[in-house]
Amino acid sequence: MMRSHYCGGLNRENIGQEVTLSGWVHRRRDLGGLIFIDMRDREGIVQVCFDPKYQQALTRAASLRNEFCIQIKGEVIARPDNQINKNMATGEVEVLAKELSVYNAADVLPLDFNQNNTEEQRLKYRYLDLRRPEMAQRLKTRAKITSFVRRFMDDNGFLDIETPMLTKATPEGARDYLVPSRVHKGKFYALPQSPQLFKQLLMMSGFDRYYQIVKCFRDEDLRADRQPEFTQIDVETSFLTAPEVREIMEKMIHGLWLNTINVDLGKFPVMTWTEAMQRFGSDKPDLRNPLEITDVADIVKDVDFKVFSGPANDPNGRVAVIRVPNGASVTRKQIDEYTQFVGIYGAKGLAWLKVNDVNAGLEGVQSPIAKFLTEEKIKAIFDRTSAQTGDILFFGADKWQTATDALGALRLKLGRDLALTQLDQWAPLWVIDFPMFERDEEGNLAAMHHPFTSPKDFSPEQLEADPTGAVANAYDMVINGYEVGGGSVRIFDPKMQQTVFRILGIDEQQQREKFGFLLDALKFGTPPHAGLAFGLDRLTMLLTGTDNIRDVIAFPKTTAAACLMTEAPSFANPQALEELSISVVKTDKE
């Protein structure tokens, strides 16, 4: 037998038992006549004592070094009272080693487990990085999450059905990863950005509750919370309304938090997209932050200050305020830094006003813009924002999107900088009723979610006549400012689907080429259906308290979509390329 117990599982109940442990030397201490090691496996660490009573084991222990892979046979004994370590789960016991076997020695480590290592080092030697207890704990939590999800889905009548990895390229927002076909020369498969169309087809096939924990792929520019391959908890249902879908999924996430970290998330509030953008400047608001955005365009539309009056009189403009309670102590240097910060989001400046005495009107404020405001305007702004003595007001005035983005980002930064955001709290919500379409950089209409989302209370004719007025029957789940899941009611009427395609500039020929199979399937008694997908990586990130998605993926890529450990991607064998009828064209940059 190689193992009878895990190191991290030993406690007082095991005292007197003979155990066999297998794992790694985490730390070694030579005290002359005695040698102690901390022995580690995936479940934790236990102290092992080598005593002269068992001389052969003690002699062998002298050669042990960190990360040697070993086996210990010995007896669990109680630690003396003055040696109990309350910081360890196994701190009341130790193992008296009677036999020691070395499975494998370890070279000098390229990582130092007792210090911070660079991200590059950690990814290059990921198999060593994963030995660290905190990394092991994160992957164990991930396994616990998927286990809970599978049980929940099974208990609620969902079927785990796999969908293809090699599929057809369809426009879903990001670039596809393409896989060449050897048999069909010149043709390519695409790795799926999501199982979207296949899960809709499963609804058309009669499988009214589907789920899958599935890999997805997107060839896009990466951020700290993005990876080229990521994992979704993918869900689709038939004959359920949007509120019913949300109710089931909220129940799952509620149970997941209770099961994983023993936190009761309570009832999730529901907020429209419009309200979220107006009050918080984001469609994924972090409600742990008490700061809100207040519109004041109607108050300042006739002031003699074009920075305010211009956007205030522009139908596409916005003038709004963030009130920071007790923020008047913010220094001019900090204000300059905040002004520079909002510039990242396109804002041309940042007006501010300190409230030194809320009852003194203009005399009680300190601001470069005070000269443009009357007593009446000041009072109206104070009343609208509930300003108090000692507050500071920050103003955003620009095109609606620019002002909203800038103030939304500033709100988050102020919350962090001034310790207003309650970091020890959980704040979930649903955001619903998104616009059906948005303008892209060229000014063309694009689907805010994807082109298979159904509009709310619009006929195909109404949608074609007023596409920008349509509201999508879509919903996102947001927790602490992160979108952890999103979905929608799907289009199940072929006429509506063709209308959406036309609005997006996809003509009939392209519709047949790219989506002919879907349009055909919609003609054969398609049920009403709705679904959503959760990002498993992001859920795990939140539940383990890390801010980097790479910390919860066993073998992640860098922000350049590379694997430093295996050195992927790599050049292909010329013979393999020839069989695929592919030639590599070198550019001047190479």
UniProtKB/Swiss-Prot annotation:
Residues that bind ATP: 218-220, 227, 483, 535-538
InterPro entries linked to this entry: Aa-tRNA-synt_II (IPR004364), aa-tRNA-synth_II (IPR006195), aa-tRNA-synth_II/BPL/LPL (IPR045864), Asp-tRNA-ligase_1 (IPR004524), Asp-tRNA-ligase_1_N (IPR047089), Asp/Asn-tRNA-synth_IIb (IPR002312), AspRS_core (IPR047090), GAD-like_sf (IPR004115)
Molecular function terms, GO-annotated: aspartate-tRNA ligase activity; ATP binding; nucleic acid binding
Keywords: Aminoacyl-tRNA synthetase, ATP-binding, Cytoplasm, Ligase, Nucleotide-binding, Protein biosynthesis
Stretches the record annotates as Aspartate: 196-199
One Pfam family of this chain: tRNA_anti-codon
Known EC number: 6.1.1.12
Record-linked Gene3D superfamilies: Bira Bifunctional Protein, Domain 2, GAD-like domain, Nucleic acid-binding proteins
Major localization listed first in the record, in broad terms: cytoplasm
TM segment ranges: none
Residues the entry annotates as binding L-aspartate: 172, 218, 449, 490
PROSITE patterns: AA_TRNA_LIGASE_II
Cellular compartment(s): Cytoplasm
One GO location term (cellular component): cytoplasm
Biological process annotations from GO: aspartyl-tRNA aminoacylation
Catalytic activity, as annotated: tRNA(Asp) + L-aspartate + ATP = L-aspartyl-tRNA(Asp) + AMP + diphosphate
Function: Catalyzes the attachment of L-aspartate to tRNA(Asp) in a two-step reaction: L-aspartate is first activated by ATP to form Asp-AMP and then transferred to the acceptor end of tRNA(Asp).
Subunit composition and interactions: Homodimer.
Family statement drawn from the similarity comment of this UniProt entry: Belongs to the class-II aminoacyl-tRNA synthetase family. Type 1 subfamily.
Name recorded for this polypeptide: Aspartate--tRNA ligase
